[in-house]
A protein has these predicted regions:
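Alpha-helical transmembrane segments of multi-pass small-molecule/ion transporters
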Residues: 1-366, 378-385
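Short linear segments in intrinsically disordered or otherwise low-structure-confidence regions
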Residues: 366-372
Length: 385
């Protein structure tokens, strides 16, 4: 129980993140896979079903990205009711903000940052721009969940981004990069793998769990599932740093050169949209969901396109992305929860209290606030001065 509290406590979670990175780099060095050429997860799964996948140490570890993402997303999906999804679809203002941020601002903002910081390096420039044109369709649900945001709304926004980027991704690639030859179906396949499968299993788990254990019993069971999100996050970090640790050890300047514009992008986009949501009268949960859906980038799609349509150097540039994005987005979760206590009338519960069962009678102290609770109580912000 004490370990669970440490995992969910944002005062100690950064140490687990750093430890996972170090373990990943150590594993990569020990097995000689720290500069591994990644196969896009979708292609790897197809090859497995066709009986053509070579289960080397590196290839097997690479499948851990898929497993880690599932472990992160599935617990959040068990937190969702079908009725919550119906209510979340009636949020046109939130949807418009996400659409404007992701398709009118984000691609061009990332392009401007690439021009400022990477103008002399065509490969890194292309990799950064490519990373910026595709909104995230998976991990933003996890970060919304960790920040105690509106997970059903985040899911609806992700579904919108999934469809929109299938149409707009080739357009932005053409405008900002030039002629790019890639299959847009890879976006649809990623939606099924990272969104559809966890959603279906999560809804089925909730339905079966409530039928067998009752609402209160399932909530206590789900508190244990919540730990999988953090475990999946740390496991994904181990895998990514294990396969690409040489980027940091042998050529840290590549990471640093990519880290500066990417960190600026994430902090500016998140805080701008988060504050905009507050000013527009959103409650904390909605403001967080909208901000993360406007900030996160789809590194799986960016890497897949880079591998299939560009030089290896561009692929390396996109592979740096998640090494930077995940720790930065975790810091944004911390910022959201800290600032939420000041900006919004209803205080935001500490993360460890929200995700770990209490020691009191019944152990029900970990019930989350928000759309997934049986009686949602949305916080309302005070009128800005």
């Amino acid at each position: 129980m004490r370990l669970l509290r440490y995992l969910h406590d944002f005062r100690t979670l950064p140490f687990f993140v750093l430890f996972s990175m170090a373990v990943g780099i150590g594993i990569g060095k020990a097995f000689g896979i720290s500069d591994y050429e990644l196969t896009p997860p979708i292609d790897a799964i197809k090859d497995i079903f066709r009986g053509r996948y070579d289960f080397t140490i590196g290839n097997t570890l690479a499948l851990g990205v898929v497993a880690g993402l599932f472990l992160m997303i599935y617990p959040a999906m068990t937190n969702i009711r079908v009725d919550d999804l119906g209510a979340a679809t009636r949020s046109p203002k939130q949807l418009l903000i996400v659409a404007f941020a992701n398709y009118a601002i984000a691609p061009f903002f990332m392009f401007a940052l690439a021009e400022v910081f990477l103008r002399g390096d065509e490969d890194l420039h292309t990799g950064l721009v490519l990373y910026g044109i595709a909104p995230c369709i998976a991990m933003v649900i996890v970060f919304t969940f960790l920040a105690l945001g509106n997970t059903p709304l985040a899911l609806v926004l992700v579904a919108f981004n999934s469809v929109a980027q299938m149409i707009l991704l080739p357009v932005y690639a053409k405008i900002l990069i030039g002629n790019v030859d890639f299959d847009v179906l890879v976006v649809g396949e990623s939606v099924v793998l990272y969104l559809g499968l966890p959603l279906v299993l999560g809804l089925l788990t909730r339905r079966a769990g409530v039928a067998r254990l009752g609402e209160a019993g399932f909530e206590r069971f789900r508190e244990g599932l919540n730990t999988l999100s953090v475990v999946g996050l740390l496991f994904t970090l181990v895998v990514m740093f294990g396969l690409k640790g040489d980027l940091i050890v042998n050529d840290p300047m590549i990471v640093l050169r990519m880290a500066v514009p990417m960190t600026i992008f994430f902090f500016v986009m998140f805080n701008a949209v988060y504050v905009a949501g507050w000013r527009l009268g959103f409650n904390y949960e909605d403001a967080v969901a909208v901000a993360f859906n406007s900030t996160g980038r789809d590194f799986e799609i960016a890497i897949a396109i880079a591998i299939t349509a560009f030089s290896p150097a561009v692929a390396v540039a996109t592979e740096v992305g998640p090494l930077i994005e995940v720790p930065v987005m975790l810091s944004l979760v911390w910022i959201a929860m800290r600032s939420g206590q000041r900006l919004f009338a209803a205080p935001v519960a500490p993360l460890e209290a929200a995700l770990v069962p209490s020691d009191g009678p019944g152990g029900a102290g970990g019930e989350r606030r928000g759309a997934a609770s049986s009686a949602p109580t949305w916080s309302e912000r005070p009128r800005p001065m």
